């Protein structure tokens, strides 16, 4: 049976592939942090993503007006800062917890689009799960407060990514992803150089950075920009609730990270 590319099921499939790609790659990224740090890892990831997307999307062919450029630039900046905050977070706290806290972004989008009482009940449950993860009580498992703050900052940027990503996709189509990656890479590169210096360009790091660029940015963000054109922002935010569990499983399988019972309960509250 042929599935239309405009079908909601097609868009959902793209999102699932995107989430799997991002979370498996995040485990790889954590192995690079001890070498060059989160800032340089983010910069290289975005740089390679931009290079990979250039010949595919051919953004120079897009005829954009000044008005169309604004959402693309904001999309690129939110992408860059989101990634750097997220990498700073998971360098300090478990991957699954970091993604769960970052989920405050899509959760906020879902709240803004909710109209029914049942929607607010589910959102309240998710907020309760997030409170369980905050380092304000013994159940949080002694999470690093700086890591938590970075994860929440990444969540804010994720909300901006969804908001501006939909507008960027409408303005420039597939070229928006490539242009956004260029903007994000240019914004984060100074932080990477300041943090790691020339070591970020060593041959032991570049192959890993290329893999991150493809599977953490180029592929998933390309898939997401297509999905965002077909799905309402609220639906996108709800579907992304699967991401914390995928992240936790990736952390367990690839990094040997373990979550306590309260943290698993919190994740369950968030994704329900």
Protein language model regions, located:
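C-terminal-most transmembrane helix of multi-pass membrane proteins
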Residues: 2-4, 46, 205, 241-272
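Hydrophobic transmembrane alpha-helices of multi-pass small-molecule transport proteins
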Residues: 104, 118-137, 154, 250, ...
